Swiss-Prot record:
This is Biotin synthase. Its cofactor is [4Fe-4S] cluster; [2Fe-2S] cluster. It comes from the Bacteria. Its EC number is 2.8.1.6. CDD domains: Radical_SAM. Pathway: Cofactor biosynthesis; biotin biosynthesis; biotin from 7,8-diaminononanoate: step 2/2. It comes from Hahella chejuensis (strain KCTC 2396). The gene is bioB. GO terms for biological process: biotin biosynthetic process. One of its GO terms (molecular function) is 4 iron, 4 sulfur cluster binding. Homodimer. It catalyses: (4R,5S)-dethiobiotin + (sulfur carrier)-SH + 2 reduced [2Fe-2S]-[ferredoxin] + 2 S-adenosyl-L-methionine = (sulfur carrier)-H + biotin + 2 5'-deoxyadenosine + 2 L-methionine + 2 oxidized [2Fe-2S]-[ferredoxin]. HAMAP family: BioB.
Amino acid sequence: MQSPIRHDWSLEEVEALFALPFNDLLFQAQVTHRRNFDPNEVQVSTLLSIKTGACPEDCKYCPQSGHYNTGLEKEKLLEVEKVVNEAKAAKEKGASRFCMGAAWRNPRAKDMPYVLEMVKQVKSLGMETCMTLGMLTADQASELAGAGLDYYNHNLDTSENYYGEIITTRTYSDRLETLQNVRDAGMKVCCGGIMGMGESARDRAALLAQLANLPSHPESVPINMLVKVKGTPLEVQEDIDPFDFIRTIAVARILMPRSHVRLSAGREDMNEQMQAMCFLAGANSIFYGEKLLTTPNPEADKDMMLFKKLGIRPEQREQAHSEDQQEAYLHDVIQAHDQQQRMESMFYDATKTA
């Protein structure tokens, strides 16, 4: 039985979830997760920076901002062929989704034809496509949707109340407008935030409430842990407590039960035990590879070793091209479902009352 979808969460309700005893919160999140997903599958995505550095925005966490001296080498927009080759390599390593990010305030008209061609060619590989290019007009969103872009990433970063402490060059309403343009164009939304930027527990609750109360939940919700980069204003920010981060994952899972909750930036600084707790709390998506745009990420082989230890497998994006393939795929799905049913029959759901 899938969990009901709500869009009317009060801040007090969300704060009450954060305040639950840790074990109770994780139990509730895990039950919600199992009702909506295979608990042992994790979506694997790869992220490529297609244009690096010299961004005019002043996001205090970002090494790509032109406002700070972080030593980052600027790069122009990559050639389409190079992007496609990177996507092929990612697919060979097990990625089912390929995400492309550009350090822009918004895409310029002269760059759009190249960006659209990237989408078309990566899509032709049988991969899901995602982009993050900054703010979008309604027309730009329609162009991307027409090229076949599946997802558009545009994070809210933090609560509306704390937002001005982190970014001043674009408003919270600017971000919400881009999200609406993406939705109106028919694309799926990838939207989350960054934890550990000095925000309060109430700010974390407010961010998740904002996401859960959107007209449609984001299909992907990246929960990032701040990566402190030398030269940015947040380089000396105090670390977030790991339990507070795991709580954020768990509450996101409960509020948005059918969304992929992505364990995103910051994994390089998490040990295996913390990552395992995040998966238990409902995270079921990761970025895979050695870099997230410009910050380190666990090596792909380390991820697969962790998956093996935990009995986790990558989520597959199946594309059957013949009746035989379709029949084989359906047979595998039925077998997996039967196995899951047998496993569930060995346990009882303590959340159900007689």
